[in-house]
From Swiss-Prot:
Residues 137-181 are annotated as: Disordered. Residues 160-172 have a biased composition (Basic and acidic residues). It comes from Glycine max. It is found in: Cytoplasm. This is DCD domain-containing protein NRP-B. The keyword Cytoplasm applies. Keywords: Cytoplasm, Stress response. Involved in stress signaling pathway that mediates cell death in response to endoplasmic reticulum (ER) stress and osmotic stress. The gene is NRP-B. It comes from the Eukaryota. InterPro entries: Dev_and_cell_death_domain, NRP-like. Over expression of NRP in protoplasts induces caspase-3-like activity and promotes extensive DNA fragmentation. Transient expression of NRP in planta causes leaf yellowing, chlorophyll loss, malondialdehyde production, ethylene accumulation, and induction of the senescence marker gene CP1.
Length: 330
Protein backbone atom coordinates (compact mmCIF):
# COMPACT_ATOMS: atom_id res chain seq x y z
CA UNK A 1 0.00 0.00 0.00
CA UNK A 2 2.83 2.34 0.90
CA UNK A 3 4.58 1.48 -2.35
CA UNK A 4 1.47 2.38 -4.30
CA UNK A 5 1.13 5.71 -2.47
CA UNK A 6 4.78 6.50 -3.08
CA UNK A 7 4.50 5.79 -6.79
CA UNK A 8 1.39 7.93 -6.97
CA UNK A 9 3.13 10.88 -5.34
CA UNK A 10 6.08 10.50 -7.65
CA UNK A 11 3.74 10.57 -10.62
CA UNK A 12 1.99 13.68 -9.31
CA UNK A 13 5.31 15.44 -8.80
CA UNK A 14 6.37 14.66 -12.35
CA UNK A 15 3.02 15.87 -13.63
CA UNK A 16 3.41 19.20 -11.83
CA UNK A 17 6.86 19.66 -13.34
CA UNK A 18 5.44 19.23 -16.82
CA UNK A 19 2.34 21.36 -16.24
CA UNK A 20 4.02 24.64 -17.13
CA UNK A 21 5.38 23.20 -20.34
CA UNK A 22 2.05 21.67 -21.34
CA UNK A 23 0.34 24.99 -20.79
CA UNK A 24 2.46 26.57 -23.50
CA UNK A 25 1.43 24.11 -26.23
CA UNK A 26 -0.77 25.25 -29.10
CA UNK A 27 -2.95 23.29 -31.51
CA UNK A 28 -0.29 23.42 -34.22
CA UNK A 29 2.22 21.44 -32.15
CA UNK A 30 2.33 17.79 -31.38
CA UNK A 31 2.53 16.88 -27.71
CA UNK A 32 4.22 13.67 -28.78
CA UNK A 33 7.18 15.44 -30.24
CA UNK A 34 10.39 14.03 -28.80
CA UNK A 35 12.26 17.31 -28.60
CA UNK A 36 9.44 19.70 -27.85
CA UNK A 37 9.91 19.84 -24.06
CA UNK A 38 13.61 20.50 -24.37
CA UNK A 39 12.96 23.67 -26.38
CA UNK A 40 12.63 27.09 -24.82
CA UNK A 41 9.38 28.96 -25.18
CA UNK A 42 10.80 31.55 -27.57
CA UNK A 43 11.98 28.72 -29.82
CA UNK A 44 8.57 27.10 -30.03
CA UNK A 45 5.77 28.00 -32.39
CA UNK A 46 3.06 30.25 -31.01
CA UNK A 47 0.23 31.51 -33.15
CA UNK A 48 -1.61 33.11 -30.23
CA UNK A 49 -2.77 36.63 -31.10
CA UNK A 50 -2.80 39.36 -28.52
CA UNK A 51 -5.07 42.34 -28.74
CA UNK A 52 -3.23 45.07 -30.60
CA UNK A 53 -0.35 42.73 -31.37
CA UNK A 54 1.03 41.54 -34.69
CA UNK A 55 0.60 38.16 -36.23
CA UNK A 56 3.79 36.13 -35.96
CA UNK A 57 5.63 39.18 -34.75
CA UNK A 58 8.49 37.21 -33.23
CA UNK A 59 11.73 36.72 -35.12
CA UNK A 60 13.46 33.43 -35.10
CA UNK A 61 17.19 32.94 -35.03
CA UNK A 62 18.86 30.17 -36.97
CA UNK A 63 16.54 28.01 -39.08
CA UNK A 64 15.81 24.65 -37.53
CA UNK A 65 15.10 21.44 -39.38
CA UNK A 66 13.20 19.46 -36.77
CA UNK A 67 9.80 18.05 -37.52
CA UNK A 68 6.94 20.36 -36.55
CA UNK A 69 8.87 22.33 -33.95
CA UNK A 70 8.67 25.97 -35.01
CA UNK A 71 7.93 28.25 -37.91
CA UNK A 72 11.36 27.71 -39.38
CA UNK A 73 11.15 23.94 -39.00
CA UNK A 74 7.73 23.41 -40.54
CA UNK A 75 6.25 20.19 -41.83
CA UNK A 76 8.60 20.22 -44.82
CA UNK A 77 11.44 21.97 -42.96
CA UNK A 78 11.15 25.01 -45.19
CA UNK A 79 13.44 27.95 -44.23
CA UNK A 80 11.94 31.01 -42.63
CA UNK A 81 11.75 34.05 -44.83
CA UNK A 82 10.31 37.49 -44.31
CA UNK A 83 9.15 39.21 -47.48
CA UNK A 84 7.01 42.28 -46.83
CA UNK A 85 5.86 40.79 -43.49
CA UNK A 86 4.67 37.66 -45.29
CA UNK A 87 6.10 34.41 -43.94
CA UNK A 88 6.51 31.75 -46.60
CA UNK A 89 5.45 28.35 -45.31
CA UNK A 90 4.97 25.26 -47.43
CA UNK A 91 5.48 27.35 -50.56
CA UNK A 92 2.35 29.45 -49.98
CA UNK A 93 1.76 33.05 -48.99
CA UNK A 94 1.66 34.70 -45.59
CA UNK A 95 0.50 32.65 -42.60
CA UNK A 96 -2.98 33.64 -41.53
CA UNK A 97 -4.87 33.14 -38.33
CA UNK A 98 -5.19 29.44 -38.92
CA UNK A 99 -1.51 28.78 -39.49
CA UNK A 100 -1.42 29.40 -43.26
CA UNK A 101 -4.98 28.23 -44.00
CA UNK A 102 -8.07 30.33 -44.29
CA UNK A 103 -11.16 28.20 -44.02
CA UNK A 104 -9.51 25.39 -45.90
CA UNK A 105 -8.45 27.60 -48.83
CA UNK A 106 -4.78 28.15 -49.56
CA UNK A 107 -3.57 31.68 -49.79
CA UNK A 108 -1.98 32.94 -52.97
CA UNK A 109 1.45 31.55 -53.84
CA UNK A 110 4.38 33.55 -52.67
CA UNK A 111 5.71 33.96 -56.18
CA UNK A 112 2.59 35.97 -57.02
CA UNK A 113 4.00 38.77 -54.90
CA UNK A 114 7.24 38.99 -56.83
CA UNK A 115 5.92 41.98 -58.69
CA UNK A 116 6.02 43.87 -55.39
CA UNK A 117 9.80 43.72 -55.44
CA UNK A 118 10.64 43.55 -59.16
CA UNK A 119 10.40 46.66 -61.30
CA UNK A 120 9.25 45.72 -64.78
CA UNK A 121 10.39 49.09 -66.16
CA UNK A 122 6.90 49.94 -67.35
CA UNK A 123 6.43 53.66 -67.79
CA UNK A 124 2.90 54.53 -66.66
CA UNK A 125 3.12 57.92 -68.37
CA UNK A 126 3.02 56.30 -71.78
CA UNK A 127 6.41 57.60 -72.95
CA UNK A 128 8.21 55.47 -75.49
CA UNK A 129 11.08 53.44 -74.13
CA UNK A 130 14.49 53.00 -75.65
CA UNK A 131 13.66 49.61 -77.11
CA UNK A 132 10.53 50.94 -78.78
CA UNK A 133 12.48 53.82 -80.28
CA UNK A 134 15.03 51.40 -81.72
CA UNK A 135 12.30 49.23 -83.23
CA UNK A 136 9.99 51.86 -84.72
CA UNK A 137 12.35 54.79 -85.12
CA UNK A 138 15.76 53.40 -86.07
CA UNK A 139 18.73 55.69 -86.11
CA UNK A 140 20.64 56.74 -89.19
CA UNK A 141 23.38 54.23 -88.53
CA UNK A 142 20.88 51.39 -88.38
CA UNK A 143 19.28 52.54 -91.64
CA UNK A 144 22.71 52.58 -93.24
CA UNK A 145 23.38 49.06 -92.02
CA UNK A 146 20.02 47.92 -93.39
CA UNK A 147 20.90 49.34 -96.81
CA UNK A 148 24.26 47.58 -96.76
CA UNK A 149 22.61 44.31 -95.76
CA UNK A 150 20.07 44.71 -98.52
CA UNK A 151 22.83 45.32 -101.04
CA UNK A 152 24.75 42.27 -99.88
CA UNK A 153 21.51 40.30 -99.96
CA UNK A 154 21.00 41.21 -103.61
CA UNK A 155 24.54 40.08 -104.39
CA UNK A 156 23.89 36.80 -102.60
CA UNK A 157 20.70 36.32 -104.59
CA UNK A 158 22.62 36.84 -107.83
CA UNK A 159 25.23 34.30 -106.73
CA UNK A 160 22.49 31.86 -105.81
CA UNK A 161 20.90 32.32 -109.22
CA UNK A 162 24.24 31.57 -110.89
CA UNK A 163 24.66 28.48 -108.75
CA UNK A 164 21.14 27.33 -109.56
CA UNK A 165 21.80 27.76 -113.28
CA UNK A 166 25.00 25.77 -112.98
CA UNK A 167 23.15 23.11 -111.03
CA UNK A 168 20.46 23.09 -113.70
CA UNK A 169 23.08 22.54 -116.39
CA UNK A 170 24.54 19.72 -114.34
CA UNK A 171 21.13 18.13 -113.86
CA UNK A 172 20.60 18.34 -117.61
CA UNK A 173 23.57 16.01 -118.07
CA UNK A 174 22.31 13.48 -115.55
CA UNK A 175 19.08 11.63 -115.02
CA UNK A 176 16.47 12.61 -112.44
CA UNK A 177 15.50 10.00 -109.84
CA UNK A 178 12.32 9.09 -111.72
CA UNK A 179 14.37 7.97 -114.74
CA UNK A 180 17.07 6.03 -112.91
CA UNK A 181 17.21 2.99 -110.68
CA UNK A 182 17.35 3.45 -106.91
CA UNK A 183 20.90 3.39 -105.62
CA UNK A 184 20.34 0.17 -103.71
CA UNK A 185 19.27 -1.72 -106.85
CA UNK A 186 21.65 -3.46 -109.23
CA UNK A 187 21.35 -2.74 -112.92
CA UNK A 188 20.26 -5.90 -114.75
CA UNK A 189 19.84 -4.62 -118.30
CA UNK A 190 19.49 -1.57 -120.49
CA UNK A 191 17.18 -0.37 -123.26
CA UNK A 192 18.61 1.87 -125.98
CA UNK A 193 16.35 3.96 -128.21
CA UNK A 194 16.43 4.56 -131.94
CA UNK A 195 14.13 5.38 -134.83
CA UNK A 196 13.86 4.28 -138.42
CA UNK A 197 16.62 6.70 -139.46
CA UNK A 198 19.21 5.59 -136.91
CA UNK A 199 18.42 1.90 -136.43
CA UNK A 200 20.42 0.73 -139.44
CA UNK A 201 23.52 2.55 -138.22
CA UNK A 202 23.12 0.99 -134.77
CA UNK A 203 23.15 -2.52 -136.20
CA UNK A 204 25.85 -1.85 -138.78
CA UNK A 205 28.32 -0.31 -136.35
CA UNK A 206 27.29 -2.64 -133.51
CA UNK A 207 27.21 0.46 -131.40
CA UNK A 208 24.35 1.86 -129.37
CA UNK A 209 24.18 5.50 -128.35
CA UNK A 210 22.03 7.92 -126.35
CA UNK A 211 21.96 11.74 -125.84
CA UNK A 212 24.47 13.47 -123.50
CA UNK A 213 22.19 13.40 -120.45
CA UNK A 214 22.56 9.59 -120.33
CA UNK A 215 26.36 9.65 -120.01
CA UNK A 216 26.48 8.83 -116.30
CA UNK A 217 23.79 6.20 -116.68
CA UNK A 218 25.49 4.43 -119.59
CA UNK A 219 28.80 4.34 -117.69
CA UNK A 220 27.21 1.78 -115.37
CA UNK A 221 27.03 -0.76 -118.23
CA UNK A 222 29.56 -3.59 -117.98
CA UNK A 223 30.50 -6.24 -120.58
CA UNK A 224 27.96 -9.08 -120.74
CA UNK A 225 24.97 -6.99 -119.66
CA UNK A 226 21.74 -7.78 -121.62
CA UNK A 227 20.74 -4.92 -123.94
CA UNK A 228 17.61 -4.17 -125.93
CA UNK A 229 16.87 -1.70 -128.72
CA UNK A 230 13.56 0.16 -128.80
CA UNK A 231 12.40 1.74 -132.07
CA UNK A 232 10.00 4.53 -131.15
CA UNK A 233 8.99 4.95 -134.81
CA UNK A 234 7.44 1.47 -134.85
CA UNK A 235 6.98 1.13 -131.05
CA UNK A 236 8.75 -2.24 -131.12
CA UNK A 237 11.47 -3.73 -128.91
CA UNK A 238 14.32 -5.60 -130.61
CA UNK A 239 16.67 -8.10 -129.02
CA UNK A 240 18.62 -9.74 -127.72
CA UNK A 241 21.96 -7.92 -127.51
CA UNK A 242 24.87 -8.02 -125.14
CA UNK A 243 27.31 -5.32 -124.05
CA UNK A 244 30.76 -5.98 -125.55
CA UNK A 245 32.46 -3.10 -123.72
CA UNK A 246 32.04 -0.79 -120.80
CA UNK A 247 29.71 2.11 -121.30
CA UNK A 248 31.52 5.34 -122.12
CA UNK A 249 31.50 8.64 -123.96
CA UNK A 250 32.27 9.13 -127.65
CA UNK A 251 33.58 5.64 -128.21
CA UNK A 252 33.09 6.36 -131.90
CA UNK A 253 32.72 10.13 -132.41
CA UNK A 254 31.96 9.62 -136.09
CA UNK A 255 28.76 7.70 -135.32
CA UNK A 256 25.65 9.86 -135.68
CA UNK A 257 27.93 12.80 -136.31
CA UNK A 258 26.51 16.21 -135.62
CA UNK A 259 26.52 18.27 -138.81
CA UNK A 260 26.71 21.49 -136.84
CA UNK A 261 29.67 20.24 -134.77
CA UNK A 262 31.91 18.02 -136.92
CA UNK A 263 33.78 15.36 -134.99
CA UNK A 264 31.13 15.18 -132.27
CA UNK A 265 28.36 12.62 -131.99
CA UNK A 266 24.76 13.54 -131.34
CA UNK A 267 24.57 10.45 -129.10
CA UNK A 268 27.85 10.42 -127.17
CA UNK A 269 26.70 8.00 -124.43
CA UNK A 270 27.79 4.84 -126.22
CA UNK A 271 28.54 1.14 -125.75
CA UNK A 272 29.68 -1.56 -128.14
CA UNK A 273 27.35 -4.55 -128.57
CA UNK A 274 27.11 -8.02 -130.03
CA UNK A 275 23.96 -9.85 -131.09
CA UNK A 276 23.05 -12.74 -128.82
CA UNK A 277 19.75 -13.66 -130.42
CA UNK A 278 17.76 -12.53 -133.44
CA UNK A 279 14.10 -12.48 -132.51
CA UNK A 280 10.90 -11.11 -133.80
CA UNK A 281 10.38 -7.66 -132.29
CA UNK A 282 8.03 -7.41 -129.35
CA UNK A 283 4.95 -5.25 -129.50
CA UNK A 284 4.30 -2.71 -126.80
CA UNK A 285 1.42 -4.54 -125.18
CA UNK A 286 3.70 -7.51 -124.43
CA UNK A 287 6.62 -5.72 -122.77
CA UNK A 288 5.28 -2.42 -121.44
CA UNK A 289 3.61 -3.99 -118.37
CA UNK A 290 7.06 -5.16 -117.27
CA UNK A 291 8.73 -1.74 -117.43
CA UNK A 292 8.74 1.10 -114.93
CA UNK A 293 6.81 4.07 -116.33
CA UNK A 294 6.94 7.78 -115.49
CA UNK A 295 5.30 10.86 -116.97
CA UNK A 296 2.64 8.83 -118.70
CA UNK A 297 3.92 6.69 -121.61
CA UNK A 298 7.63 7.21 -120.86
CA UNK A 299 9.49 4.25 -119.38
CA UNK A 300 12.79 3.91 -117.59
CA UNK A 301 15.69 2.74 -119.75
CA UNK A 302 17.62 1.27 -116.83
CA UNK A 303 16.36 -2.20 -115.98
CA UNK A 304 16.65 -3.98 -112.68
CA UNK A 305 17.34 -7.72 -112.59
CA UNK A 306 13.68 -8.89 -112.46
CA UNK A 307 12.73 -6.64 -115.39
CA UNK A 308 15.64 -7.86 -117.51
CA UNK A 309 14.86 -11.52 -116.78
CA UNK A 310 11.20 -10.98 -117.63
CA UNK A 311 12.09 -9.51 -121.02
CA UNK A 312 14.43 -12.43 -121.73
CA UNK A 313 11.65 -14.86 -120.86
CA UNK A 314 9.27 -13.20 -123.33
CA UNK A 315 11.83 -13.44 -126.12
CA UNK A 316 12.55 -17.07 -125.19
CA UNK A 317 8.90 -18.00 -125.56
CA UNK A 318 9.11 -17.33 -129.30
CA UNK A 319 11.36 -20.41 -129.75
CA UNK A 320 13.63 -18.56 -132.15
CA UNK A 321 16.68 -18.61 -129.92
CA UNK A 322 19.95 -20.24 -130.95
CA UNK A 323 22.90 -21.80 -129.13
CA UNK A 324 24.35 -18.37 -128.36
CA UNK A 325 21.30 -17.50 -126.30
CA UNK A 326 21.63 -20.79 -124.43
CA UNK A 327 25.06 -19.67 -123.17
CA UNK A 328 23.70 -16.42 -121.67
CA UNK A 329 24.10 -16.62 -117.89
CA UNK A 330 20.89 -16.26 -115.91
Amino acid sequence: MENNNQSFWQFSDQLRLQASNLANLSLNDSIWSNNYISKRRDERINFDIKVGGEINSFKSKDPACDYNDNVNGSLLAMPYNNNNNNNIILGFGGVGLNGGFNKGIYSKPAFANLNNNINLNINPKGHKGKVEDELFHPSKSSKKNNNLNKKHGDNNNNDNNKDSKAAGDKRFKTLPPSESLPRDETIGGYIFVCNNDTMAENLKRQLFGLPPRYRDSVRAITPGLPLFLYNYSTHQLHGIFEAASFGGTNIDPSAWEDKKCPGESRFPAQVRVITRKTCEPLEEDSFRPILHHYDGPKFRLELNVPEALSLLDIFAEQDTFNDAFEALPA
